[in-house]
Amino acid sequence: WREKLEAEVQRQNLYQERVAHMESSLGQARERLGRAVRGAREGRLELQQLQAERDGLQERREALEQRLEGRWQDRLQATEKFQLAVEALEQEKQGLQSQIAQILEGGQQLAHLKMSLSLEVATYRTLLEAENSRLQTPGRSSQASLGFQDPKLKLRFLGTPENQHLGSVLPVLSPTPLPSPLPDTLETPVTAFLKTQEFLQARIPTLASTPIPPMTEAPCLAKAEVRAQDAPLSLLQTQGERQQAPEPLWAKATASVSTGVLTELEEAGGQQPGHFPEDATASAPSLSPHHPVLEAKDGDSTESRGSSIFQEDEGQIWELVEKEAAIELKVESSLAQETQEDGLHTEEIQDSQGPLQKETLEALGEEPLMSLKIQNHETPGKENCNSLRSVDENQGTLKSPEEEKQTLLKSLEEKDVEVEKTLEKGVPELSKPLGKEDPRIEDQELMSPEGTLETLSFIGKRNEEVVRSSEEENIESLAAFKKESQHPLGCPEEEIQRVERLIEKEGQESLSSPEEEDQETDRPLEKENGEPLKPVEEEDQLFETLIEKEGQESLSSPEEEDQETDRPLEKEEDQLVERLVEKEGQESLSSPEEEDQETDRPLEKENGEPLKPVEEEDQLFETLIEKEGQESLSSPEEEDQETDRPLEKEEDQLVERLVEKEGQESLSSPEEEDQETDRPLEKEEDQLVETLIEKQGQECLSSPEEEDQETDRPLEKEEDQRVERLIEKEGQESLSSPEEEDQETYRLLEKENGEPLKPVEEEDQRVERLIEKEDQESLSSLKEEDQRIVKTLERENWESLRSLDENLDTVMPLESKNQKPLKSLEAEEEQRIVKPLEKVSQDSIGSLEKENVELLRSLEDDQITESLLKKGTQESLESHEDRNQETQDPQRFLEEEGQGIVKQLEKENQGFLGSLEEEKVVKRSLERENHEPLSSVEKDWVTESLLERESQDSGKSLEGQEAFRCLGKEDPESLQFPEVQDQEIQRSLQQETQQTLGALGDEQMASEPPEKVGPELLKFLGNGQEIVRSLEEQNQESLVSVKETSVETAKSSDMEDIEPLKSADEDLEIINSAGAQESLWSMEVTRETTRPLEKEVQESLGFVGGNQEILRPLERGNEELGSLGKWNLEAVDSPEAVEEGRQPLGEEACLEMGEHQEPPRSLGEVEQGLPGSGNQQKWEDRAVENAAADQGPTLGRTGIESEDEAELPLSGQGEKEEDAEERELQLDAMGEAWSLASSEPQEPRVPSEGGSAGAPQGLEGQSEQVGVLGVPVGQGMPEVTEPLLQEDVAQAGKRDPIELTLGSDAATRAGLGLEQEVAGSGGSRHLAREEAIHPSLGEESVEAKIAHDLEGPGKEPKEAGALESEISELPRTSSDVLESKGCKQSEPVLGWAVEEASVEASDHEGSDAPEPRPSETEGDEGAQAALAPPGPKLMEPCSPTPILKDAYEWQPQAEGTRETGRQLEGGSASLERVEDEQEFGLGGIPEGLQDWEESREESEADELGETLPDSTPLGLYLRSPTSPKWDQAGEQRLSPQGEARKEGWGPAVPAAQGLSNPPGEEERGHDSDLSSEEFEDLGTEASLLPGLPKEVADHLGQVPPGPEPECWDQGGESDGFADEEESGEEGEEEEHEDGTESGAQWWGSGPSKVQHVTQRGDLQEHESVGISGPWDDGWRGAAAGISVTGLETESQDSAEPSGSEVSESVSSEGEDQAPDHLDTPQGVTNVVPGAGDTFGISGQAPNLESEHMNGRLENGLEQSEGQGVLDRHQDQGHPSQQQEVGALKAPLLGSPVHRGPSQSLEFPLSGADRDSWSSGED
């Protein structure tokens, strides 16, 4: 009985114990439930806040977009008005020209009439005298008749010497008549002249009694006929041509000569009747140059009569006529020279000299010289003639060309002043006056970049030719005068001396005329600029100082830019100086300059005028440039400049540095806008400059990177140019249309001015100077322009050398000819005169020869220097490559370790799969239960976060608006000029920078080893990454199955162990703790990243143009994304969607964290007391918040950053292009992974959605929204926002999932379209991918990239500093967030791969021009995608299998989803948000997807169960690497793996690319074939990766598990996430160890761990990431259910959640199907290059991509610049918001962290990339 009693007691005790235990468990469960409910409420509140904030941001974006469009319209209107004014002026000019021509013709006719009258009078006098003599001596009647005949004969024969005498006298008379006839003729009615001419011609026949007048005209006609008959036809034809072309000149010369002749004839006639006919005959021959034409036109009878008469005296008359013609030509040249001395401009002199020389040559019979001169002068001469005509017309209008030029310059000056004022007043006003003024200037600039270089070379040629012509004319005039002296014209030697003096003066003037022209051009420019051009040197110095100040003051005032823009006008000299400097820079700058100076010196000697001002200016300019170059040497760009310095050493470096300073400072300033605006112009220049610079850079930087870049550049350039042209056509259609109109107007002006082109040339030079100044302001543009100009100058120098040689040749033959006639000259004085002239010519020739030799030597020296530079660049590139390879080696090692970790984690996960699945099932139910309240909480929380973000974003948007306004103000100027220049310069700078990156690469490679690594390395890395991808994909497939099983088991076990409430509470706590840690991590990473990013930002300042250009499309994409964001907001509004997003997000976040943190973070988060999971929750929240933020804030942020980033896109687009190129290269490195995977598709999707331009705007919009959201969050809501953001994100996740689902469909479609576009952009994307891969090599590069991205855009310097400060201010929460993001990045690597592919797709699809930026954007979007992967979506990407299923499902849908994918670009942000929301829990996610994701999360939880204690909140477990916390944890885990992560990012991105590689490739198919190829290459590399079964690598294809960081980059998106989870777990420990480093290490060598973590996480995630496909499927289903467009982003979001669930379901399948699915994504990638890519990853990643792309297009692109900074701020400022945003940004942050690789990528998207990153971080 006692035993029974005791047994009963024991039973009771046991029951009591059980009851107590159950009660305690119940209490714990209730506590968890209460926490989960609270978290859900908070999430709801934050979601509501985020939604409200997003709405506000959307409104702001819309307002900003409207404002921007209004400005564009104003600019277009102003441009149209300006064009109309220009057309009116041109018409007026033409009318004046015709009037002048008529007046000249009338003057000629009057002169003929006077001659005929004088001849008639003389004839009558002779008759009267003969009659008188006969009457007086009637017996001498016969003698009288003979006497009468004798005068006639005398008139015929003696007329010849007297004609010659008149010819000699003409110089005396003509100097004054030449200028005087014009005013006189102008005063004289044309009709009177015509009548008089007709009357004269009419009377000539009636002068039967006066045979002399007919003879007189006969000699003229006879001369014409004789010339036609006896004279070489070439002479006559040449004369005819000259008469036709230079006819005004002839008319002027003839009129002046005729006037002088008539004056003499009248005087002589009054004195000597015999001399009148002779004089008349002489003047008739002088007139004959026209006269053959005029009289031939006027009457053939006279001509026939003249010819009959002439036939009598044919021989003598012909000789006389020939001599007279030569003399006349020489005299005319001398007269023209004297006239020039009298006030005619050197241009006129040159112009007149050209035709005079031609005529003289013709008269001399110097046909060869004529042909040469005609050829040389036909261009310059015709233009000179045209300019002389215009000058004559101007003179005829009593306005000297100088006056006209001054007027034009004054108008231009006034316009510049007005432009400055308008710039000061505002961009809208600026756009109008700029549109009016600058369009012409822009057109002139457009023409000036091309035309100006041509004009410079042409001017140089013209000057040389003018000098030649002056020398030749002098020589010819001397020869002619000698001939005349030999054929005693009866003209005193004094006249000959005078003529020779005039010729010498003329030669000096002509020699100095180039200089004078330049100076005169500068003078009008000075007049216009209100500043003397000689002070142009001072101005150059001032300009350099101003540029430095402006660069230092970030181009504080638009006026300075305008002044600098005016200075560019002044820099016509400066351009000449630049030409010299560039010649020297190309020819060691100094030697060409010295040669030019030497050339100028002999010219000075010849000209008797010192060219020293120009030389001094050049020297000063070069000195300033050298100083600036030396000053800016410190910066990486300075290194680039140093590399370029040999080419551009002084000016280019100085300009680049100043421009860098300005660009860096003004990148955030309107300069970006201006650059964008100006980029159309600049792009033309930049394209020219890029072509030159590419040539130079390719020559100088023949390194593999340069070769790759050059190889890619042709493609990129073509694509970029095409894209830029398309973007310019789109974004700059307004600009380019005004610019084209301006160019057309400018061309018309050139046509008008073409005749006085010199004013236009001066304007062109001025415009070039403005452009150069603006280009200097946009260092890259200046650098490129400088290089281009240097090349042009070199060419011009060569041409000038050639021209000098030709001149020497011409002068030498002329000298020889002249010497022969001079020798023949009997007059010693004439010989003396000729000798000095010969000496002068010989001296000039000798000096020219010496100069030529010196120039040749300098060119040789330059070539040697270039070869040395090339060698150094190649060596530096090789060292970079070595470093990259070394970086890749640790990455591969890390990847291998990560793969091993992933395998271990897989085993552990498999062990925990059952328990995790059970826990996951329990957790699913709990989470479902929790997600409902959580969805409301998330909504509240997301709303709060959104509201906070909105408030902060509003603050930042206001800042952004202010910055945008400032930028807008500065931009209008730079929009018109720097834009094209900046674009071209940015291209050239991109090229140069890319080339210089070789040199800088060594230094930058430390920070951006992948980035700096040459495209070859990038390609190599891409291949290795592809191998790694395949390995990672294989590993990820296995890991995905294991992970899915583990996650499901972990989830089930966690669900069981952790009651729903506890799991929910713990999820929230984990999210919060993970968010906090992630925020800390992201803070650390952000700090670390920001520091290198700041460096890179400074470096990327040159790329700001490209970023700005990219931002333009980003702005467009933002606009599109605005709609997407609206859809996202709408989707976010749905609690269910938020809950869905939140469930998968929470699950994924837990899974992600669990998986990601399992090895490291299980310990780390357990060690961190689930702070990691709290952080992960925060990450999830942040992901949700970011989902909401990406969607809502993306919209609002798009509005805000749309402006900022629109500005950044505008100003930074060119640089961003450069950055895009470099970053494309870098992004191709690391971006091969993420850029391929996600970057582009996102952007492409958005572009597909709204079109290429719209996509960039949408991207920009989202980027801005996300960026604005990110920044405000970063600033205002450091940690409070974090929970709010978490809640908001949770809510946003709930809403966003639907949004994302819808948006993802739309985004997928967009992604398809974009990917198609991206396919075109593949080359650049591939480069970007490689760059992305390389950036993934080193976190330094990531940080540098981030810093570069932060600093990269114009606002990069400032915002980078702010971000840096914020980042530093932000507790390591941001670093943690970044690190967590890094963890996410490990997972997001997938997202990145997807996003990069999306970005690449969006980049290339979004805009071909922004392609580079898309590369960055790819990186950014890749980061978003990668960060988005931290959400379930990322986990899905991390789950190769689900991705594969999804990829299969998606890939069929991929094509449609591709289209949606492009829409998903918009939706990708939504998907990203969905991920984040899914991390928060996508309550709205279909239960199937939720179940699938939950199962996936359970499997991940199982893995986490192994690594994390059951007590670890499922939030940790379920926080998949995709979860913000997972990402944070993962990022933190990956932080040791941060390098692995970085690389892992790259590899993870490749993994994502591998997973998304099908999508990525398809994206790349859209994005670029390179993208898919790179994915395939990455897959191949992945297959080659050690530790990964080739089969796995094949399956992973482009998602190599992560043994190789590159593989991670390449294929390891899913694998990257799987690895990232594994390595994130290992790396979690390492990350806790390396924590801060890991951010860099992720980027650096950490990828392997990150890859392992990511691969493991990816495999786990691929279990969940498999969802990605299912996401895409479910997402597509949801998207299909929801409006693809409106819900496109939502589609992505819900699709992501659905994908998460699907990933879970697929993860189960994916385990089995993982290889198949991975293969399938690849297959689908092949099958659906666009869709498959997007959907391969888009299956998981396209959603991520789409989401990230969407968020990243929205956030990624726009945030690329603004958001990168803003998001970075957000990461820093609002750890929780960051973490929420980190959930989004984690996907995006993966991209920001990936952005670290993106650093390496240093996209021109630096700003946009940062924004994308920030959005990614958000």
Curated annotation (Swiss-Prot):
Q: Which GO terms describe its biological process?
A: brain development; embryonic camera-type eye development; positive regulation of intermediate filament depolymerization; positive regulation of neural precursor cell proliferation
Q: Where is the composition biased (Low complexity)?
A: 1698-1708
Bias (Polar residues) = 382-398, 986-997, 1686-1697
**In the record, which positions carry Phosphoserine?**
133, 180, 288, 390, 400, 448, 513, 591, 737, 803, 824, 915, 957, 1052, 1063, 1073, 1123, 1134, 1162, 1238, 1495, 1499, 1523, 1614, 1623, 1698, 1700, 1791, 1814-1815
Q: Does the keyword Phosphoprotein apply?
A: yes
Any one cellular-component term (Gene Ontology): intermediate filament
- Region Linker 2: which residues? 15-17
Which residues does UniProt call coiled coil?
Answer: none
Q: Where is this cross-link: Glycyl lysine isopeptide (Lys-Gly) (interchain with G-Cter in SUMO1)?
A: K1043
Residue numbers spanned by region Disordered = 266-309, 336-355, 377-451, 480-787, 866-900, 945-998, 1134-1262, 1334-1818
Region Coil 1B, annotated ranges: 1-14
Cross-link Glycyl lysine isopeptide (Lys-Gly) (interchain with G-Cter in SUMO2) maps to which residues of the chain?
A: K1043
Region annotated Coil 2B, chain positions: 18-135
What keywords are assigned to this protein? Coiled coil, Developmental protein, Intermediate filament, Isopeptide bond, Neurogenesis, Phosphoprotein, Ubl conjugation
Q: Which family does it belong to?
A: Belongs to the intermediate filament family.
Could you give the subunit structure recorded for this chain? Interacts with FHOD3. Forms homodimers and homotetramers in vitro. In mixtures with other intermediate filament proteins such as vimentin and alpha-internexin, preferentially forms heterodimers which can assemble to form intermediate filaments if nestin does not exceed 25%.
Q: What does this protein do?
A: Required for brain and eye development. Promotes the disassembly of phosphorylated vimentin intermediate filaments (IF) during mitosis and may play a role in the trafficking and distribution of IF proteins and other cellular factors to daughter cells during progenitor cell division. Required for survival, renewal and mitogen-stimulated proliferation of neural progenitor cells.
Q: What name does the UniProt record give this protein?
A: Nestin
Name of the gene: NES
